[in-house]
Structure formats: structure tokens, C-alpha cells
Amino acid sequence: MTLPFADSAQSTLGIEWELALVDAVSGELRSEAPDLLRTLHATEGLAEDDVNPHMTSELLQNTVELVTGVHERVDAATADLGRIAARVADAAAARGISLFCQGTHPFADAIAQPSTPSERYDRMLDLTQYWGRQLLIFGVHVHVGLDDVSKAMPVVNGLVNRVPHLLALSASSPFWAGTDTGYQSQRTLLFQQLPTAGLPFQFQEWEDFERCVAQMEQVGMIADVTECRWDVRAVPRLGTVEMRACDGLATLEEIAAVTAYTQCLVDDLSASLERGETVEVLPPWHVQENKWRAARYGMDATVIVDARGTQVPLAEHLPAEIERLTPVAERLGCAAELAGVQAMIDDGGAA
């Protein structure tokens, strides 16, 4: 099997924002996404097309996903996202609906939420049963372009090392069905129950990734590569790597901060590969432990930062990361947005 990697300009980016529709008075979920999307897609400038869908349905009828176009700068991408969100919010308000985003809804009954009719979703729910019907979750996904397919797997591996950092920054789902779970990201624990979700396998070469996908299709694990729902993944049809570990974020400022951090990480990893350097691959047992710690403790987590087992509090390691990446951010034009990471750290994480 070959998976062609689309042409993409280095470090261009796009953002996906999953939003819940809730009653403006009670905060209860409202399963009106199909009707709302029909209205919005008939609005000038928001019609769905192959290049820029703007907004799409999701697994549940209480959710809409907003999708930016391709941008070079974080400020342009977040402005695009804000424009779309404002149009959606206006249309929703006319129905008595507000937009809501955290990693989970704090008190709703997940099982009671109707799913969106779709062959793909129906197949997933039939396969995963109880756990699939628990996926009342919302996230922010960031795509960053790569100009060479040979960079894809090393960059994915490098981003995996920073999953706990981005997860802890964004963790916003301590409550589930009205209960304080004791975790900062209940969303993380729920989503990884799917057999093709969670942390990705670590490959060095694109051909190894192609071989894995081919074998997964052969034995019926997935229908195609889009069903690899990993926390970090390469997206061949877009020529990007995608960071999917973040909980839902409530503000554009927070989205801008995690987007800038992700863009800077990818650009820095790409530059190191161009210099002939190798990307450190943490042992999978360290990667798995780091993810769990971030989900459990959020910004209070201590993470393992190298193969020797060195441990550093995230609240110390992240500021050092931001300082290290600031020259990259200045070159990319996202220094102000990257500085927003420190503001999130000072606040203890996401709103």
C-alpha cells in the first residue's frame, strides 16, 4: 500500500474546534446540529465545499465542528475561526442555543445523546458498543503542514513527547455525569477506549506507517487511514501532522496559544531534521505514563522528559519550552500567541 502525502507548505496550519450546542437557559445539550448546519450551509460565505468545509457535523447531533482554511500565521487562523464561530453563535442564538466547549459536558447523560446518521459513525458505534456511546467529548485539533513526507514520522514522534504538555494545558473535563472524576481530563480516558484511538505507534519511516495501515485494513481493524484516531497522526490527504490530544478550549486566546505552541514544535522539529539531527523517541512506557499523569493531574503533573527517566514538573518544563521556542515563534509571527501559553500556566491551565 502507498499513501501519497499531499503537497503542503512547511508550517502552514489549520484548526478544528468541536463545540457543543446547549440550551441558553438550562445548559442542557440540544441535539439540533443537523438543522443548524442546514441553515448555515445556505448562508453566503459558509457553504460547505471540498476546499473549506467551514463547519461539519460530528458523531453526536449536539455537536458542530468548525474548520478553518489553510493559513501561514496563527493570528489569521484564529481570526478565521472567530469569524465562523460568530456566525454559528448568531444562528444558534436565534434558536435559544449557546455554544459550549470543554473536554466533556459536566452533567449530561452520554447514552441519551442521539448520533448523527452516517455509515462511518454507525459502523464505529456497532463495533465499540458501550464505549462508543460514551463519546460525549469535545476537542481542539491543530494541523501543521510538512513540505517533505520523510519528516512525517519523526515529527509525529517528537510531538508525542509533548502530548502531556498540550494535554495538561488544555485539560478542562474534570466532571462526568455530574461527578468529579478526580481527573483533569476525563475526555482523555474516554477516548482512548476506542481500539484505534490513543497514542500512536512510533515509526521512523513513512513506509513503516504505510505497512501498518495496510495490515490494519487487511485484518479489518479500520476501513481506511482516517479511522486511525490517534492523539497525534499524519494526515496524508492534507500533507499535515495533526495534534489531537487537546481537550476542548473555551476561548480563542487559549486556542491561539496551543496552536502557536504546536506550530512552533513542528517547525522546530522540521528544522532539526533538515540539519541532519535525529528526533528523540521516548520509550513507549514513558510516553504512556506521561499521558496518564497529564490527564490525572493537569498542570500539577510531573513528566518524564528523556529516556534516562529524568522527571520535571510540567509547570517548570513548559516555561523553559516557551523560552526555547520564542525565536521560532518570532520568525513565524506567533510570538504573542505563544506567550499566551505562559498566561495559561499562570492560571493553572485552561479556563
Locate the predicted segments by residue:
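C-terminal accessory/tail domains of diverse enzymes
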Residues: 1-95, 124, 191-351
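Well-ordered mid-protein domain cores that form the structural environment of catalytic cofactors
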Residues: 69-137
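Metal-dependent DNA replication initiation modules
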Residues: 102, 106, 119, 123-140, ...
